[in-house]
Amino acid sequence: MRIKNKIKKRIIELIDLAYITARKGDLELAREYIKLAEMYSRKGRVKIPLKYKRMFCRKCYTPLITGVTERRRIRSKILIRTCLICNWQRRYVLSRNKGSNKEN
């Protein structure tokens, strides 16, 4: 297995572990796991997959759990995700699913 694949696998494991740890209530340990995953990503020059990149706050490294550490709002087809720890906001444009109800 290539080294970059091993690094990516470890990054994913750390982010998953951080999410589980945050659910149990230990946010400080969860932040440390995410910081470590970010460090692996930078040192190994490996991109964090988009699915996992969206799982944590980029300002305070807190795992985003809806209702616990994150608030979600939809305003005019824009999803606004707000970290409840540091008030960092990220906006995503909501688009129609590619395969559903296409008009010909």
From Swiss-Prot:
- Which Gene Ontology molecular-function terms are recorded? ribonuclease P activity; zinc ion binding
Q: Which GO annotations describe the biological process of this protein?
A: tRNA 5'-leader removal
Q: Name one GO cellular component term.
A: ribonuclease P complex
The record's annotation in Pfam families points to: Rpr2 (PF04032)
The record describes its quaternary structure and partners as:
Consists of a catalytic RNA component and at least 4-5 protein subunits.
Q: Quote the function comment for this protein.
A: Part of ribonuclease P, a protein complex that generates mature tRNA molecules by cleaving their 5'-ends.
**Similarity comment: family membership:** Belongs to the eukaryotic/archaeal RNase P protein component 4 family.
Indicate what this protein is called per its UniProt record: Ribonuclease P protein component 4
